[in-house]
Amino acid sequence: MGSADDQASRMREGTVEVVGAGEAGRARDRSPSGSARGRGGVRTALRARLAAGLADAGFDLEDVTVTRAGSRSVVRVVVDRDGGVDLDAVADASRLASELLDAAETDGQGLVAGPYVLEVTSPGVERPLTEPRHWRRAIGRLVTVRDRDGIVLAGRVLSADESGADLAVATDPARPGRPPRRRLARVTFAQVARATVEVEFSAEAYDDLSIESVETPSLSAVLVEPGETADLGYGEPDDDLPAAPGRESNDDGREAGPRGAAGKEMTR
């Protein structure tokens, strides 16, 4: 890493790079004579400068924020892409974003006045789903949706298009040896006030459902109050969706336990 004097010298030359787990950044000394804008204007200018260049490399610019950290600003850039963003992708996006900002300064369009640190990172797991592409990338994940009237629905994303998404919604608790009952629910994005992906420590496996020719209700028809369950009132339950295996019962109705040392089934 070098001595403190070496680090200070390199910082003055604008060549210090900072790379951390899950994010990459570059620290640069900038002249305080750069363009002075309000914070909202800086964000807009940064987004305009970065979005197209990142898109050409296959990245979606999800967010840009500018905050103060002591004598510097921190420019935080959030990127995503289909298939997810790993550390190598974050490093690539960081280099590209730094080059784009360097080019802006060379053109006399310094976007952030004074020294700043550039941080590039991927979205958090619980980031809001605000674009169709967010829903597409959340297929297979459990989400919680709140509509504009404050009513809540929870389900697993099965598919998504430009106007909405189809969820598998549990309607009854799982029975031993049987998967929980589920119904298809259609979520229309125009009705959604907020939607987030839920963190799961042990996610169940779900097979694809066939939703062709199924008349799915609107979000307002299937949303439930917190603590309640929804019964969408059409079709048979999708019991072919696997759940964690339950215990089996033998012929006389007693629950079958583990087998003994000799392989004989033990009952309780």
From Swiss-Prot:
Species name: Frankia casuarinae (strain DSM 45818 / CECT 9043 / HFP020203 / CcI3)
Low complexity: compositionally biased ranges: 32-41
Gene name as annotated: rimP
Amino acid composition bias (Basic and acidic residues), ranges on this chain: 248-257
SUPFAM superfamilies with a match to the protein in the record: YhbC-like, N-terminal domain
The UniProt record lists the keyword Transferase: no
Record's keyword terms, sorted: Cytoplasm, Ribosome biogenesis
Function: Required for maturation of 30S ribosomal subunits.
InterPro entries, per database record: Ribosome_maturation_RimP, RimP_C, RimP_N, RimP_N_sf
Chief place of localization: cytoplasm
Protein name: Ribosome maturation factor RimP
Family from the record: Belongs to the RimP family.
One Pfam assignment: RimP_N
Subcellular location as annotated: Cytoplasm
Region (Disordered): 1-41, 223-268
The keyword NADP is annotated on this UniProt entry: no
GO biological process: ribosomal small subunit assembly; translation
